[in-house]
Amino acid sequence: MVVAGIDPGITHLGLGVVAVEGKGALKARLLHGEVVKTSPQEPAKERVGRIHARVLEVLHRFRPEAVAVEEQFFYRQNELAYKVGWALGAVLVAAFEAGVPVYAYGPMQVKQALAGHGHAAKEEVALMVRGILGLKEAPRPSHLADALAIALTHAFYARMGTAKPL
């Protein structure tokens, strides 16, 4: 199973693709990883357009069975939520155009799936990603580590039969 994971952000969007191997213990290979960067000085339409184009290009290249995104929770940061929504919209349109279903997972679900408990630190989750992917070091920067964790989380829930598309 090939899964694209996305940590949505308008300035830094984590984008990772993994190939999950067989059954049994969760093991996977890293196929692609990057952080798509945009500048706050650019017009919004250019930032969103660049994110959309890059995500669509990766989806066409790797042909994942699913796109998994991190659900965002903003309590008092309305402007940040608004701008992250731009990035998420670009991802949703790219997934639609590529014909790939989209799934969303919250931070607690990611921690539970990869570390076995919902209160794991980011570093603990990154180390689990490193182990599952067989990497020498934990993925960096954090946006990439989060994107890969989200992709692996989808693989975990898909194996359990509990994954539901947006």
From Swiss-Prot:
Name the UniProt record assigns to this protein: Crossover junction endodeoxyribonuclease RuvC
The written remark on domains in the entry is: The wedge motif stacks with DNA close to the Holliday junction point; Arg-76 interacts with and eventually disrupts the T:A base pair cleavage site, and subsequent to cleavage may prevent their reannealment.
- Native source species: Thermus thermophilus (strain ATCC 27634 / DSM 579 / HB8)
Function, in words: The RuvA-RuvB-RuvC complex processes Holliday junction (HJ) DNA during genetic recombination and DNA repair. Endonuclease that resolves Holliday junction (HJ) intermediates. Cleaves cruciform DNA by making single-stranded nicks across the HJ at symmetrical positions within the homologous arms, yielding a 5'-phosphate and a 3'-hydroxyl group; requires a central core of homology in the junction. The cleavage reactions can be uncoupled; the presence of a 5'-phosphate in a half-cut site is required for second strand cleavage. The consensus cleavage sequence is 5'-(A/T)TT(C/G)-3'.
Could you list this entry's UniProt keywords, alphabetically sorted.
Answer: Cytoplasm, DNA damage, DNA recombination, DNA repair, DNA-binding, Endonuclease, Hydrolase, Magnesium, Metal-binding, Nuclease
Taxonomic lineage from the root: Bacteria, Thermotogati, Deinococcota, Deinococci, Thermales
Motif Wedge: which ranges?
Answer: 74-76
- List of residues binding Mg(2+) 1: 7, 143
Outline the subunit composition: Homodimer which binds Holliday junction (HJ) DNA. The HJ becomes 2-fold symmetrical on binding to RuvC with unstacked arms; it has a different conformation from HJ DNA in complex with RuvA. In the full resolvosome a probable DNA-RuvA(4)-RuvB(12)-RuvC(2) complex forms which resolves the HJ.
Effect listed in the UniProt record for changing residue 146 to N:
Loss of HJ resolution
